[in-house]
């Protein structure tokens, strides 16, 4: 890891090393180029920054706390663990940070309709929320499989006025929802703004979503200085597409003393075909407008991911994560469904916080590591979302485990 400036990407072509870029249909190219121009202009406009700051503070509820997880720290008997409390945001996750930024950009561009894809439903809820706030019609593409396991969020989106389009192609999950959203965008290029929910897609989306999420890491830096007088020693976040992780990581990338760990969904184990760990079990390829690591078979076809967590159930990862993996600035590991469920329960019992199953993957890795670290090691875990949406999934798994136990007895 000889490079010292890890925050300079992407280049003018949207590349982070060999990853990223703009792999889109000819009809979309003028649109993404226009979006890039508008975003660059918005970044340079103090009025845009002022409006962003207003909504982040008074609508989203930022800054959210950096919380010392005292009982979890005692339980692990090692590192001092802090939670960055993104689940306290309006709508219950980090997704709203990005949605506020993109809806303000859509408004600036004069777009009259929003579309989005969603997996766990949190990005769908956040998009429906900002659509309601700004009086824009909104269509959410969601895989039929995810609709089944995220009924509460589907109802929330409908309450907020969104139209939900079930996607039955493929496995009916996030990848398929994104495919359908891209088709909609091609058809309705003039009036529609595609509000992508993660650090993927064609340039400028990976950089734009990262920039809107970087408030997570910026606040963490300031809050840790206030609380401990120094930088944290390690950062841990779950990674699907990777927006909460990139939001936490990016402001720290050039701080060599800070160890950074991204946690992928290991499903039933990365040695099986039932996981969603693109970096630990995938190879480079092109999907959804960018080159990144993807789960593929021997013929280069995208394979079906698996995770107990709908938000991590994606066969790719943001291109900047792929770059950071290759240059070894960030370590990417995987956590299985069972490990995530164990951490989910521990967090509930020890801290009185019900985390999202996505977040539970990061918590599981944090607990593994904390036990072997000194008590002056400062660790920050991104609590990316709350677990209300996952109650049915957890109930089903607990019921299945009880049945298995009964059979054994």
UniProtKB/Swiss-Prot annotation:
The modification N6-(pyridoxal phosphate)lysine is found at residue 95. Keywords: Amino-acid biosynthesis, Aromatic amino acid biosynthesis, Lyase, Pyridoxal phosphate, Tryptophan biosynthesis. Its cofactor is pyridoxal 5'-phosphate. GO terms for molecular function: tryptophan synthase activity. Pfam families: PALP (PF00291). GO terms for cellular component: cytoplasm. Pathway: Amino-acid biosynthesis; L-tryptophan biosynthesis; L-tryptophan from chorismate: step 5/5. Its EC number is 4.2.1.20. It catalyses: (1S,2R)-1-C-(indol-3-yl)glycerol 3-phosphate + L-serine = D-glyceraldehyde 3-phosphate + L-tryptophan + H2O. PANTHER family: TRYPTOPHAN SYNTHASE, TRYPTOPHAN SYNTHASE-RELATED. NCBIfam families: trpB. Belongs to the TrpB family. Tetramer of two alpha and two beta chains. The beta subunit is responsible for the synthesis of L-tryptophan from indole and L-serine. This is Tryptophan synthase beta chain.
